[in-house]
Amino acid sequence: MSENNILCIKWGNKYDDSYVEKLKEQCEANCSVDFNFWCFTDNPTHDYDIELPTYLDKHYQEDRGFFWAWRKCYMFDDHVDGDKFLFLDLDVIIHQDVKYFFELPMNKPWIVRGWWNDDETVKRNYSKHKSTPLNSSVIRWDRGQMTSVLQHVKDNAEVIFFTYPSLDNYFAHHWYNPWEDEGDLQGFPKGDIYSWYKGNIYPEDMEINKLRPDHKICLFNNSTYTEGNSDEEIKKLW
Protein backbone atom coordinates (compact mmCIF):
# COMPACT_ATOMS: atom_id res chain seq x y z
CA MET A 1 0.00 0.00 0.00
CA SER A 2 1.19 3.48 -0.82
CA GLU A 3 1.44 6.24 1.80
CA ASN A 4 -0.46 8.47 -0.67
CA ASN A 5 -4.26 8.35 -0.62
CA ILE A 6 -6.69 10.04 -3.00
CA LEU A 7 -10.20 10.24 -1.56
CA CYS A 8 -13.61 11.14 -2.91
CA ILE A 9 -17.14 10.99 -1.52
CA LYS A 10 -20.38 9.90 -3.18
CA TRP A 11 -23.78 9.81 -1.52
CA GLY A 12 -27.37 10.02 -2.64
CA ASN A 13 -28.34 10.36 -6.29
CA LYS A 14 -26.60 13.56 -7.36
CA TYR A 15 -23.72 11.67 -9.02
CA ASP A 16 -23.74 8.19 -10.51
CA ASP A 17 -20.86 5.71 -10.53
CA SER A 18 -19.50 7.13 -13.78
CA TYR A 19 -18.23 10.19 -11.89
CA VAL A 20 -16.22 8.04 -9.50
CA GLU A 21 -14.80 5.94 -12.32
CA LYS A 22 -13.92 9.03 -14.33
CA LEU A 23 -12.17 10.63 -11.37
CA LYS A 24 -10.23 7.42 -10.81
CA GLU A 25 -9.21 7.36 -14.49
CA GLN A 26 -8.10 10.99 -14.32
CA CYS A 27 -5.99 10.29 -11.23
CA GLU A 28 -4.38 7.24 -12.84
CA ALA A 29 -3.56 9.30 -15.93
CA ASN A 30 -2.30 12.31 -14.00
CA CYS A 31 -0.39 11.05 -10.98
CA SER A 32 3.21 9.94 -11.39
CA VAL A 33 3.54 8.57 -7.83
CA ASP A 34 1.87 5.49 -6.40
CA PHE A 35 -1.42 6.11 -4.62
CA ASN A 36 -4.43 4.34 -3.17
CA PHE A 37 -7.86 5.42 -4.43
CA TRP A 38 -10.83 5.38 -2.06
CA CYS A 39 -14.46 6.43 -2.30
CA PHE A 40 -16.54 7.03 0.82
CA THR A 41 -20.11 6.13 -0.09
CA ASP A 42 -23.49 5.19 1.34
CA ASN A 43 -23.72 2.40 -1.25
CA PRO A 44 -20.41 0.48 -1.30
CA THR A 45 -20.11 -1.90 -4.25
CA HIS A 46 -16.46 -1.64 -5.40
CA ASP A 47 -13.17 -2.71 -3.88
CA TYR A 48 -12.20 0.93 -3.39
CA ASP A 49 -15.44 1.83 -1.57
CA ILE A 50 -15.56 2.64 2.15
CA GLU A 51 -18.97 2.79 3.80
CA LEU A 52 -19.81 6.27 5.02
CA PRO A 53 -20.35 6.61 8.77
CA THR A 54 -23.65 8.15 9.85
CA TYR A 55 -23.12 9.46 13.38
CA LEU A 56 -23.36 13.13 12.33
CA ASP A 57 -26.36 12.65 10.04
CA LYS A 58 -28.91 13.04 12.85
CA HIS A 59 -27.95 16.71 13.24
CA TYR A 60 -28.84 17.68 9.67
CA GLN A 61 -32.06 19.70 9.37
CA GLU A 62 -33.41 19.17 5.89
CA ASP A 63 -35.94 22.00 6.16
CA ARG A 64 -33.08 24.45 6.75
CA GLY A 65 -30.73 22.82 4.28
CA PHE A 66 -27.76 24.10 6.26
CA PHE A 67 -24.29 22.61 6.57
CA TRP A 68 -24.52 20.51 3.44
CA ALA A 69 -21.45 18.40 2.62
CA TRP A 70 -20.89 17.63 6.31
CA ARG A 71 -20.09 14.07 5.22
CA LYS A 72 -16.66 15.27 4.15
CA CYS A 73 -15.81 15.48 7.86
CA TYR A 74 -15.98 11.68 8.11
CA MET A 75 -12.84 11.24 6.04
CA PHE A 76 -10.78 13.12 8.65
CA ASP A 77 -11.04 10.04 10.88
CA ASP A 78 -8.56 7.15 10.60
CA HIS A 79 -10.32 4.95 8.06
CA VAL A 80 -7.38 4.05 5.81
CA ASP A 81 -3.65 3.50 6.18
CA GLY A 82 -1.02 5.91 4.93
CA ASP A 83 0.06 9.38 5.99
CA LYS A 84 -0.82 11.63 3.04
CA PHE A 85 -4.36 12.43 1.96
CA LEU A 86 -5.76 14.33 -1.02
CA PHE A 87 -9.52 14.81 -1.29
CA LEU A 88 -11.08 15.65 -4.66
CA ASP A 89 -14.70 16.43 -5.44
CA LEU A 90 -16.19 14.17 -8.10
CA ASP A 91 -16.86 17.02 -10.52
CA VAL A 92 -13.32 18.22 -11.19
CA ILE A 93 -11.06 18.14 -14.22
CA ILE A 94 -7.41 17.34 -13.57
CA HIS A 95 -4.99 19.07 -15.93
CA GLN A 96 -1.59 18.29 -14.43
CA ASP A 97 0.33 15.79 -12.30
CA VAL A 98 -1.25 15.59 -8.84
CA LYS A 99 2.11 14.42 -7.52
CA TYR A 100 2.48 18.16 -6.89
CA PHE A 101 -0.05 18.02 -4.04
CA PHE A 102 1.73 15.16 -2.29
CA GLU A 103 4.99 17.12 -2.34
CA LEU A 104 3.67 20.35 -0.80
CA PRO A 105 5.20 21.51 2.52
CA MET A 106 2.81 20.30 5.19
CA ASN A 107 3.16 22.65 8.16
CA LYS A 108 -0.64 22.90 7.97
CA PRO A 109 -3.43 21.47 5.75
CA TRP A 110 -4.22 22.96 2.35
CA ILE A 111 -7.63 23.93 0.98
CA VAL A 112 -8.87 25.82 -2.07
CA ARG A 113 -8.61 29.56 -1.58
CA GLY A 114 -11.16 31.03 -3.99
CA TRP A 115 -8.95 33.66 -5.59
CA TRP A 116 -11.90 34.53 -7.84
CA ASN A 117 -13.57 36.20 -4.84
CA ASP A 118 -13.46 39.94 -4.27
CA ASP A 119 -11.86 40.21 -0.82
CA GLU A 120 -13.95 43.24 0.09
CA THR A 121 -17.14 41.32 -0.66
CA VAL A 122 -15.87 38.42 1.44
CA LYS A 123 -15.29 40.70 4.42
CA ARG A 124 -18.55 42.59 3.96
CA ASN A 125 -20.58 39.36 3.94
CA TYR A 126 -18.63 37.58 6.66
CA SER A 127 -21.24 38.10 9.38
CA LYS A 128 -23.98 37.05 6.93
CA HIS A 129 -22.30 33.66 6.40
CA LYS A 130 -22.00 34.38 2.68
CA SER A 131 -19.18 34.75 0.14
CA THR A 132 -16.79 32.34 1.81
CA PRO A 133 -13.21 32.59 0.51
CA LEU A 134 -12.63 28.84 1.00
CA ASN A 135 -13.79 25.89 -1.06
CA SER A 136 -13.53 22.27 0.07
CA SER A 137 -13.48 20.73 -3.42
CA VAL A 138 -9.78 19.95 -2.94
CA ILE A 139 -8.18 19.39 0.47
CA ARG A 140 -4.70 18.10 1.25
CA TRP A 141 -3.68 16.99 4.74
CA ASP A 142 -1.35 14.61 6.54
CA ARG A 143 -2.53 12.10 9.10
CA GLY A 144 -3.77 13.77 12.26
CA GLN A 145 -3.85 17.32 10.87
CA MET A 146 -7.65 17.43 10.53
CA THR A 147 -8.44 15.53 13.73
CA SER A 148 -9.14 18.76 15.63
CA VAL A 149 -11.63 19.80 12.94
CA LEU A 150 -13.54 16.52 13.20
CA GLN A 151 -13.51 16.69 17.00
CA HIS A 152 -14.81 20.27 16.98
CA VAL A 153 -17.67 19.25 14.70
CA LYS A 154 -18.48 16.27 16.91
CA ASP A 155 -18.43 18.36 20.08
CA ASN A 156 -20.51 21.20 18.64
CA ALA A 157 -22.58 19.47 15.97
CA GLU A 158 -25.98 20.83 16.99
CA VAL A 159 -24.81 24.46 16.89
CA ILE A 160 -22.66 24.06 13.77
CA PHE A 161 -25.38 22.34 11.73
CA PHE A 162 -27.87 25.03 12.77
CA THR A 163 -25.56 27.99 12.12
CA TYR A 164 -23.54 27.45 8.95
CA PRO A 165 -24.93 27.30 5.41
CA SER A 166 -22.06 25.10 4.26
CA LEU A 167 -18.96 23.25 5.34
CA ASP A 168 -16.88 25.85 3.48
CA ASN A 169 -18.48 28.62 5.51
CA TYR A 170 -17.73 26.77 8.74
CA PHE A 171 -14.09 26.35 7.69
CA ALA A 172 -13.82 30.06 6.90
CA HIS A 173 -15.22 31.10 10.29
CA HIS A 174 -13.38 28.70 12.57
CA TRP A 175 -10.16 27.73 10.84
CA TYR A 176 -9.24 30.72 8.66
CA ASN A 177 -9.00 34.50 8.96
CA PRO A 178 -9.91 36.26 5.69
CA TRP A 179 -8.60 39.59 7.02
CA GLU A 180 -5.12 38.20 7.57
CA ASP A 181 -5.38 35.52 4.87
CA GLU A 182 -4.08 32.91 7.27
CA GLY A 183 -5.21 30.40 9.86
CA ASP A 184 -5.07 26.71 10.70
CA LEU A 185 -5.81 26.05 7.03
CA GLN A 186 -3.76 27.51 4.18
CA GLY A 187 -4.96 28.22 0.66
CA PHE A 188 -3.46 26.65 -2.43
CA PRO A 189 -1.41 29.27 -4.30
CA LYS A 190 -2.76 31.33 -7.16
CA GLY A 191 -2.43 29.45 -10.42
CA ASP A 192 -3.18 26.02 -8.95
CA ILE A 193 -6.98 25.73 -8.97
CA TYR A 194 -9.67 27.73 -10.76
CA SER A 195 -13.44 27.64 -11.26
CA TRP A 196 -15.25 26.96 -14.53
CA TYR A 197 -18.23 29.01 -13.36
CA LYS A 198 -16.56 31.73 -11.28
CA GLY A 199 -13.23 32.46 -12.95
CA ASN A 200 -9.69 32.38 -11.65
CA ILE A 201 -8.14 35.44 -9.99
CA TYR A 202 -10.03 38.62 -9.12
CA PRO A 203 -10.04 41.02 -10.88
CA GLU A 204 -7.54 40.30 -13.65
CA ASP A 205 -8.58 36.81 -14.79
CA MET A 206 -12.30 36.34 -14.32
CA GLU A 207 -13.37 34.81 -17.63
CA ILE A 208 -15.80 31.97 -16.96
CA ASN A 209 -16.43 28.78 -18.97
CA LYS A 210 -12.76 28.65 -19.90
CA LEU A 211 -10.31 25.78 -19.50
CA ARG A 212 -6.87 26.71 -18.17
CA PRO A 213 -4.62 23.67 -18.79
CA ASP A 214 -1.62 25.50 -17.29
CA HIS A 215 -3.37 25.11 -13.90
CA LYS A 216 -3.63 21.91 -11.89
CA ILE A 217 -7.37 21.47 -11.41
CA CYS A 218 -10.65 22.95 -12.66
CA LEU A 219 -13.62 23.08 -10.26
CA PHE A 220 -17.30 23.14 -11.17
CA ASN A 221 -18.56 24.91 -8.07
CA ASN A 222 -21.62 27.05 -8.68
CA SER A 223 -24.25 27.75 -6.04
CA THR A 224 -26.56 29.35 -8.64
CA TYR A 225 -26.97 26.13 -10.63
CA THR A 226 -29.84 23.79 -9.86
CA GLU A 227 -28.50 20.42 -8.78
CA GLY A 228 -27.69 18.28 -11.80
CA ASN A 229 -28.06 21.04 -14.40
CA SER A 230 -24.33 21.19 -15.08
CA ASP A 231 -23.82 17.43 -15.47
CA GLU A 232 -23.79 17.30 -19.25
CA GLU A 233 -21.56 20.37 -19.43
CA ILE A 234 -18.98 18.67 -17.24
CA LYS A 235 -19.14 15.38 -19.15
CA LYS A 236 -18.50 17.16 -22.46
CA LEU A 237 -15.22 18.45 -21.02
CA TRP A 238 -14.02 15.12 -19.61
Please provide the spans of the model-predicted regions:
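Short, hydrophobic beta-strand segments that form beta-sheet elements in well-ordered domains
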Residues: 32-42, 86-88, 109-112, 181, ...
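Short, solvent-exposed loop/turn segments at secondary-structure junctions
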Residues: 11-14, 43-46, 54-58, 92-94, ...
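GT-A fold catalytic core of metal-dependent nucleotide-sugar glycosyltransferases
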Residues: 45, 68-119
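A short, glycine-/small-residue-rich helix N-cap motif at loop->alpha-helix starts
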Residues: 58-71
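Short beta-strand-to-loop element that shapes/binds the nucleotide-sugar donor at the catalytic cleft/hinge
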Residues: 110-140
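Catalytic core and acceptor-binding pocket of nucleotide-sugar-dependent glycosyltransferases
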Residues: 136-238
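Short, P/G- and charge-enriched loop/turn segments at secondary-structure junctions
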Residues: 62-64, 122-129, 205-206
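N-terminal anchoring/stem segment of glycosyltransferases
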Residues: 1-61, 80-81, 222-229
